[in-house]
């Protein structure tokens, strides 16, 4: 659930930066966990050390928009079909093989 104090603080800050929005009411607020990877790129991949296990995760809250393409890539990988896009950037192994993932951060 959203923290009411943080919602109030956010609205107050919004009103400071955009005076026309001062006093704005919020009809609904959401709070929860968002999965992310250190480099902000989803993992859509087999896990080489666990045959038969495939991951599709790390969408940082953007899964709705990229879901159709990500789902197609995941389905292609599981079925052994030619992938719709190059799966290399989405490989799980980049998390454990020393690949430079950049500075950790939030997307």
Q: What does each model-found stretch correspond to?
A:
Residues 1-52:
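Active-site lid/adjacent beta-loop-alpha segment flanking the redox-cofactor pocket in flavoenzymes
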Residues 48-107:
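C-terminal lid/capping helical subdomain adjacent to the catalytic/cofactor pocket in oxidative enzymes
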């Amino acid at each position: 659930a959203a923290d009411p104090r943080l919602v109030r603080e956010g609205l107050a800050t919004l009103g400071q930066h955009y005076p026309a929005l001062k006093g704005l009411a919020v009809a609904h607020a959401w709070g929860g966990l968002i999965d992310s990877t250190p480099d902000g790129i989803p993992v859509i991949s087999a896990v080489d050390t666990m045959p038969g296990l495939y991951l599709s995760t790390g969408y940082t809250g953007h899964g709705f928009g990229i879901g159709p393409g990500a789902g197609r890539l995941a389905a292609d990988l599981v079925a052994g079909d030619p992938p719709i896009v190059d799966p290399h950037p989405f490989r799980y192994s980049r998390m454990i093989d020393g690949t430079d993932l950049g500075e950790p951060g939030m997307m």
